[in-house]
Regions:
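Short, catalytically relevant binding-site loops at active-site mouths
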Residues: 68-70, 95-98, 122-124, 147-149
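Short secondary-structure boundary segments
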Residues: 144-146, 171-174
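Glycine-rich phosphate-binding loop signature in dinucleotide/nucleotide-binding domains
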Residues: 107-113
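Distinct, well-ordered alpha-helical segments
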Residues: 72-79, 103-104, 129-131
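Long, charged low-complexity segments
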Residues: 95-97, 109, 133
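A contiguous pocket-lining binding segment that forms or flanks enzyme active sites
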Residues: 114-166
Length: 212
């Protein structure tokens, strides 16, 4: 079988490494420890897999924290910080990252119109940024198994609110497949297989499941 010619990666209606940016927002100890919509360990592992995936495909990352400079919050958890390798994340005081000038400038500077969103909590930091980005004409893709809320109901409400406004929810595995698209693109196959295999083995070894 012969693959079709590669579509224009900048104009493709699907997510590509060339037309997307990844927003990692508020993955800090307080936010993670107060998630109640799914198992916190599983959530963090999914976020790690998501970050590893976008880094493997060279997707630009905009990394932001809240209230670290003020001393009220701790920085991004090391499991993610060491993957992002960003020594100077954009620290805000705003709950809505889209109301922070430097954050919005950084997103615009990527030149990408498809935004992959991984933020805590779903009902606040994810939802507010998604709604504002959608209003400005961006396409927004919340990674549903790598975001979490203060309750299952809050998570669902935040996600539903953004979907009704036009957000397109994805899982981290579907994101990986969309970035890869063709097994004949051999350069990134080893990373994809390693990330997915590592994730599966970790889940099997701990047998942690999220609530339905």
């Amino acid at each position: 079988m012969t693959s079709q010619a590669v579509r224009d990666p900048f104009a493709d209606h699907l997510i590509t490494p060339q037309n997307s940016a990844f927003l990692l927002i508020d993955w800090q100890p307080t936010q993670i420890s107060t998630v109640r919509s799914m198992n916190q360990d599983l959530l963090l592992r999914n976020a790690v897999s998501t970050v590893r995936t976008v880094k493997a495909y060279g997707v630009p990352v905009v990394h932001s924290t809240v209230n670290v400079a003020s001393g009220q919050q701790q920085p991004t958890v090391p499991e993610l910080a060491e993957l992002v390798q960003d020594d100077d994340p954009l620290d805000r005081t705003t709950m809505n990252s889209w109301e922070d000038v430097q954050f919005v400038d950084a997103v615009r500077a990527t030149g990408r119109r498809k935004l992959i969103l991984c933020a805590l909590w779903t009902e606040i930091c994810m939802a507010f940024a998604a709604l504002d980005a959608l209003r400005e004409g961006y396409e927004v893709y919340p990674v549903v198994d790598a975001i979490g809320g203060t309750s299952l109901e809050a998570h669902r409400a935040g996600l539903q609110r953004t979907v009704r406004a036009g957000a397109q929810p994805i899982s981290w595995v579907s994101l990986a497949g969309e970035l890869q698209r063709d097994w004949a693109r051999l350069e990134t196959v080893p990373a994809l297989v390693e990330i997915v295999l590592t994730d599966r083995l970790l889940k099997e070894s701990t047998e942690v499941e999220a609530p339905v």
